[in-house]
């Protein structure tokens, strides 16, 4: 488990829309990294829409929002398009990053 002040483990994962997202490449921005179980489920949809609705405030605070689940990039692309999401959606299909962050989604 990560402790307060501990550096978050770096990762590179495929993301919605193609390409990859690397945590360390986001510097010097702050990163809001949220883990969620599954695309297009009621709670996860509400969460992603909420982050998208507040994206301007995160951007103004020099922060980037990354949602991470075990869904495939293809599922992320459908989820993003269906709800016009503005956050980055990273695919941890093997669960390696979830394991390093000691979270189960």
Q: What feature does the model see in each segment?
A:
Residues 1-105:
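Chalcogenol-based redox active-site neighborhoods
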């Amino acid at each position: 488990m990560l402790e307060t002040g501990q550096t978050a483990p770096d990762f590179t994962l495929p993301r919605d829309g193609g390409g990859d997202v690397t945590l360390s490449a986001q510097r010097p921005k702050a990163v809001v990294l949220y883990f969620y179980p599954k695309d297009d489920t009621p709670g996860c949809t509400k969460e992603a829409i909420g982050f998208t609705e507040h994206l301007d405030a995160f951007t103004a605070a020099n922060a980037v929002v990354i949602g991470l689940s075990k869904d495939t990039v293809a599922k992320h692309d459908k989820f993003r398009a269906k709800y016009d999401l503005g956050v980055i959606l990273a695919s941890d299909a093997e669960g390696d990053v979830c394991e390093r962050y000691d979270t189960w989604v």
